[in-house]
Amino acid sequence: MMRKNILVIGGTGLVGKVILRILEARNPDFNLFVGSRQSGKTNKNLIVDVNNPKTLESIIQNKIDLIVLCTKDSNNEILQFAIQNKLDYIDITKPTPDLTIAYDLARANNQKINSRIVFSSGWMGGIVSSLVDFMEPDKHKIQETNIYIYYSVKDLAGKSSANFLAENVCKPFVVYKNNQPQHVKHFLNSERFNFSFGIGKRQVYNLDVPDLFILNQIEKIPTVLVKMTYNSKFVTSLMGYFQSLKIFNIMFLKERQLLFGSSGNGDQTIFEVIIKTKDKTKRVSLQSVKGQAELTAFSTVLHIEKMLSDTLSGGIYFSHQIHSSKEVYEALNTYSTINLKINE
């Protein structure tokens, strides 16, 4: 078998570095390249600037097989380049508005697609839909799926999620109730939720993540909600006040970036998925002891390994569509710093 050449664009960032570490440990035969805007110390460091298409030539020169995108690419230059050059592509960074644009662009080029194009920017590397499928394989039975997220400001945080919140906190986004899109805003519509892993009852507020789009528009689940709480009850209630009093509206973007951009030295992250059918409610709870970056990176590595196996034909996928959900569940469950609980 030929050695696979993998390029991680944004490989010097928080999640990119962890992807490279886990990939190298699990697959020493992969040939790993790091793409960033600065030149690096070795010939494995490629200058790749998503805003400068000329720099993309190095992707062809180095015979890259698969591109992992972990940086913002507003104009979808890398996606278009991958389609044109028949390269495998996985993107883990797109927030909902950008994801829908990229997905439409890929579908418009469907006839030209000869490689595997995978969108994996759902929560924590796109594993929620796999867990939903694992809990209830018959999607037609599911009436409602709710995701509850425990987000620690002490965790190591990448810039992309903080910048997304800073830029979009004042804009409405869509949740789905009985297949009717409803416009809501971040940090409103609070409810109480009892988290597992010793966290207990917390106020949770609206959050826009791509799983809203994926679970309703792709998986056809009629009602989908996502809500989050911060580890600090004070910070959580403060965000609620700021939104309800429209304080975010009068803040400069830089100020909002500072507010959302706080990052610590690492902390756990937790999310829980509630799946409701006509006659029962199921719940799966996941804790990543090492936080968001580790979980997102490990999920991404699972997708990369699947893409490079010879079992996946060319086409457009969301990451949960490339695996059996049992494979994903078992891989997560056996990873040393991830804990899973199931209540049926």
Model-flagged regions — what are they?
Residues D49-I64, S74:
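Conserved Rossmann-fold cofactor-binding substructure of NAD(P)-dependent oxidoreductases
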Residues K94-S115:
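Rossmann-fold NAD(P)-binding glycine/threonine-rich loop
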Residues G35-S39, V50:
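N-terminal Rossmann-fold cofactor-binding loop
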